[in-house]
Structures are given as structure tokens and as C-alpha cells.
Amino acid sequence: MESPRGRPGPETDLLALGEQQAAIFGDGPGQTPSERPSDLRLSEDEEAENVGGASCHPKASLKTSSCSFVHPPEWEAPEDKPGRGGTFSGAGSRLGAPDPEFDLHGSSRRKDPEPPEAKPESERVCRRGSPVGGGMDVEQKEDDNEAAEAGRGGRSFSSRLQDSRSLDGLSGACGGPASSGGAESGAGGGRRATISSPLELEGTVSRHGDLTHFVANNLQLKIRLSGAPQPPPPAPTRPCSAPTPTPAIPPIDPDVLRDLERLSRELGGRVDRLLRGLGGAVQELTALSVGCIQTYRDAVDSLGEAVDMSIKGMYTLLARCEELERALQPVQGLARQVRDIRRTLEVLEALCK
């Protein structure tokens, strides 16, 4: 029993509505009451909202079932088209909240969904539908938003548990069939919260196969803040304590004071004598040092004078030698003459013999 005839008006009899539900859920040809129509496959989030809607307002089940109809064949496989997964989330398209006897038959095939969040009264009224044909689109959009909120609420607990895991664990959890199925059943093709949403708040997460790459935002600023010295903790203010009682001072013996004064004077006299002796020794050492310096100076002066005198005597000797050489030049002439005279005498002696 399909819905080409549209939604019935509010004046439709309740008996006719009950027969319509029986024909949809189990009285159709080739179907048992416990079977669900094969052309209507709901996602886990939509089933969770069906259960939540049935538990919140069971009295409105007949009213919401009045807008039930079978979608065309292109809406039969929402898992193949992730963007169209929210088309079955309307109040009429999800067949409303079935009666308790039909819910018992279909509960064996459903997973136990998490209880959805409590809906405000305004949303409950909007989900009951209206006789106007354009109201179904508004209800479908609202139910799409509700399905997205239910999906985020269902994954918030698991995302908190997985926040402390490593990137490999996150990539394995995000790459599993559960996360892909949840992404396919997203409402209206919108982005749904995944298990890595805490990481996406702190940076950019990209996946390539089984690997998950994470790039932190403002990495230099975070490194600079982590390396900044922390301010020292404030010093704890000490509470004003009661003044401690001063210990009682025993009486002082005057003899002790006199002995102390005498010993102090003796010590002062000894220190003065020591300082005088030290000063005399320093003066003697200073005088000795001055005498040594003067003696060294006199020795250097006398040595310089002696060297100067020796140099002057050498030059004088050289001058005298030159004068002597000049004076001996005539003697050489006389020596030649003497040799000549001697040769002449020898010749004469030879003639005389």
C-alpha cells in the first residue's frame, strides 16, 4: 500500500489509520508482521530516534503514522549515497512510532541504540505533521537536524574515550566500518562529529590510507609558550604570630666585666706592639731595598764611565801608531843607503886583496 494518494486529512478515521499501519508493517503480500519492508532501510541513528520518539510520546504514534508513504526506488539505498542519507529521517518517511505490538516484533532486528537527548516541546509538536503538503519538507529538515544532533551525542562519549589514544589508534578507529557507516548516514550531507574532532580543534588532520597526519596550528607559538619561564609562585604570607616572650636575662657578675675589660686592654696593647714591630720591619726592608737600588745605580754609572775611558784610550793608541808610522818613513831611506854603502865596502875589500 503505497502513498501516491498523498497524506490523509485530519478527518481520517482512526480505524482506517490502524488498517493502513497493519498493511504497511505486516499485512502486505509475502510479509509477516515481524518483518520490516525491504524497501525501507533505516540507519542506526534513525532507529535510535524512532525508539526515543516512541518512548517520549506513544500517544502521538497514530498521528505521526498518518503521513507514512513509500519513497521512490532511488531512495532505497542511503548507504550507497551518503549525501542522501537524511531523506528517510522525516516524521512520515520513518513510519512514525509503531504500536507496541509492532515494536515487539521488530525489536529483535534492531540494535540497542543510545537514548537520544530530551527534545523540547516545540520539536514534539512540529514532528506530528500538518495537513499541508509543504509541511513534510520542513519536518524532514528538522528531523535531519535532530538525526545529526543524535549522532553527535552518540559519539561524544566515545570521542572522549579515544582522545588519549595515539594517532595510529585514531586512524584505525576512524577508518573502521562504524565510522564510515556513521558518515554515510549523516544528515543532509552535512559534516558529522568524528572520533578525531579533538585533534581537528588543535590542527589539521589528513588521512592517507591507514596513516593519519596531524599538523598543529601555531606550532611556533606553542613551542615558545612551553619554553617560557614560569613566574615564581608568590611567597606565602605568614600570619601574624604572637610575639614570643623574651627569655629572662640572668644578672651579670661585675667581676666578669672587669676581667673582660682587662683582657681587652691587654689584647689591644699586644696588637699595638705587633703593629709597631711590623712597621719597623717594613721600614728596614724599605731602607735595604733603597740601598740596593742606589748601589746598583752607582755600579752601572761607574761601569759606563770605565767603558767610555777604554774606548777613548783605544782611539788614542791608534792615533799614536799612525804618527809613529809616519815618523819611521825616513828611517827606511836611511836603511837603503846603509845597505848601499855596505855593498860598496865589500867591493873595495875584494879589490884590495
UniProtKB/Swiss-Prot annotation:
Residues 172-191 have a biased composition (Gly residues). GO terms for cellular component: BORC complex; lysosomal membrane. The modification Phosphoserine is found at S130, S166, S197. Residues 23-194, 225-253 are annotated as: Disordered. Keywords: Lysosome, Membrane, Phosphoprotein. It holds the Pfam family BORCS6. Its main location: membrane. Residues 229-253 have a biased composition (Pro residues). Component of the BLOC-one-related complex (BORC) which is composed of BLOC1S1, BLOC1S2, BORCS5, BORCS6, BORCS7, BORCS8, KXD1 and SNAPIN. As part of the BORC complex may play a role in lysosomes movement and localization at the cell periphery. Associated with the cytosolic face of lysosomes, the BORC complex may recruit ARL8B and couple lysosomes to microtubule plus-end-directed kinesin motor. This is BLOC-1-related complex subunit 6. It comes from Bos taurus (Bovine). The gene is BORCS6.
